[in-house]
Amino acid sequence: IKDTDFDRFSARMNSDYKLIDDILTIGQHFTLNRTSEVQAPGGIIETALDIPSAIPVYASDGSWGGPVGGWPDRRNPRAVLEYNKDNRYTYWRMFGDAYVNLSLFKGFNVRSTFGLDYANKQARYFTYPYQEGTQTNNGKSAVEAKQEHWTKWMWNAIATYQLEIGKHRGDVMAGMELNREDDSHFSGYKEDFSILTPDYMWPDAGSGTAQAYGAGEGYSLVSFFGKMNYSYADRYLLSLTLRRDGSSRFGKNHRYATFPSVSLGWRITQESFMKELTWLDDLKLRASWGQTGNQEISNLARYTIYAPNYGTTDSFGGQSYGTAYDITGSNGGGTLPSGFKRNQIGNDNIKWETTTQTNVGIDFSLFKQSLYGSLEYYYKKTTDILTEMAGVGVLGEGGNRWINSGAMKNQGFEFNLGYRNKTAFGLTYDLNGNISTYRNEILELPETVAANGKFGGNGVKSVVGHTYNSQVGYIADGIFKSQEEVDNHATQEGAAVGRIRYRDIDHNGVIDEKDQEWIYDPTPAFSYGLNIYLEYKNFDLTMFWQGVQGVDIISDVKKKSDFWSASNVGFLNKGTRLLNAWSPTNPNSTIPALTRSDTNNEQRVSTYFVENGSFLKLRTIQLGY
């Protein structure tokens, strides 16, 4: 996109030093990045598509062209890019780790690592006076200077011991890890500059309104963990893992949680009764069960948060819900004292979200490992889902509150099959295909959350029993082709010849909210892939194909390509599909007739926008010599 750019500089340093033979080793791995970018303004592509081609880029006097009376309120996209070209950010990041490794005797190892990830971002965003036809900011000039800082550090200490006695082989591991993250940001804003250049436009040079913002937060995580692996004759395999994590995002009552896991394996081909099957190289049964935790919520989720909200007014109803109060009786004169508004209700009892997963699988290879593959079934259940619930009205202001409530399950199969060999004329090949299924279901949620649309259902129906993010909508049942069809249909506000007909599901003679049904499922019936590797003499070719079958997508593009009334703004550029819109001379079209107003509410969620998202694409192709 014109007047945007992106530059990145990277430097890397790695080193390892053996101080005492193989007993003591130290090392470090660090990377330094510098990124500088001018990003495209938000929505610039949409603006360029929307603005009518009849509006020139430049007016006859050389100034920027723009809409005039009666034309839509869209800015000149070329002017937007010009005024955006100085809005640059610079981002520095240094990350890496240093370690000490101690091997006191055979099989025993202790390693301690300290990791650091520090980032700093500086940016300035300029507002220049502009006049583009009727679009103007009335000579306003301003700048916002922003600083953002992120600091993450990690320290761990891990001890391992390996031992092998005859057919018995095993290893144990124990360790702990500390993590800390701190983020802060602040910005200064100033208006009215006498010189409109980036070198001059710093907040101190402005003479108008000044504002400052800033905040900071962080969290800590401590983990203790251990693992034991054991195998007998490489035939029977056992692995046990236990970890305990504590996060500052949770209250003292539930800050820590324990997550165990176990896995078992049986390599059947190592049994004596399988020795005669020489064509079977490897056959392994495996099963595992384990738990993991999730703490990805706001750092302030457990706190009750109060904030001043001075002089805020509802832009629609005009009702003031600000926190200013005339304590002194000045009848509104001057600046009033401000109280505080509760923005979040605290909950010191929120705890870790837990996922319990069970896997059962089989791995195999045959004919000197030419034919190989695996089959696996998994079942995953997530409980104590962390979610925000709207505050109860009797508690007063407060909005949302973080809670643990709800459960969700995921299950599916994964199958992988490959074949590799070499032909008589020297072509080496390896073909590997995979297919997987995945089903998801919301098992339980609080009633207010299940029906508010956050997990799916569009706020119309409870999503419990359905797929996460599945949607409810109307069933588009073709186009009204005659007045007789309109008259014989259920009462539908806005119904007319050439308009979309919606199905009366409950047969009550009225198209209303009760006629919505589950119409969108974002999970595919199955997904698949194919890896191809070919090698001949000094040439090699690699390809990766990926496909998804039986998945729904919602095409929001249709709201612009199929409706003249999109965004309720006339005179915007439209999609060429409208050239095939319904008309008396084009009665078989599936695109509704042209109209300047959406009286039939055809932009409502409906099957008209739901399409089959199945695809097969070539993800990667590489030829080497």
Q: Each PLM stretch: what is its role?
A:
Residues 108-110, 114, 434-436, 530, ...:
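P-loop NTPase catalytic cores that bind/hydrolyze ATP
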Residues 13-17, 96-102, 157-161, 174, ...:
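Residues on the lipid-exposed face of transmembrane beta-strands in outer-membrane beta-barrel proteins
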Residues 521-556:
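Glycine-rich, aromatic-lined ligand/substrate-binding cores of catalytic
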Residues 1, 238-247, 289:
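Transmembrane beta-strand segments that form the barrel wall of outer-membrane beta-barrel proteins
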Residues 618:
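Active-site and NAD+-binding cores of ADP-ribose-processing enzymes
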Residues 224-242:
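Short, contiguous hydrophobic alpha-helices characteristic of membrane insertion segments
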Residues 2, 10, 14-93, 113-222, ...:
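Surface-exposed loop/interface segments of Gram-negative outer-membrane beta-barrel transport/assembly proteins
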Residues 252-257:
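Short glycine/threonine-rich loop-to-helix capping motif typified by GTGT followed
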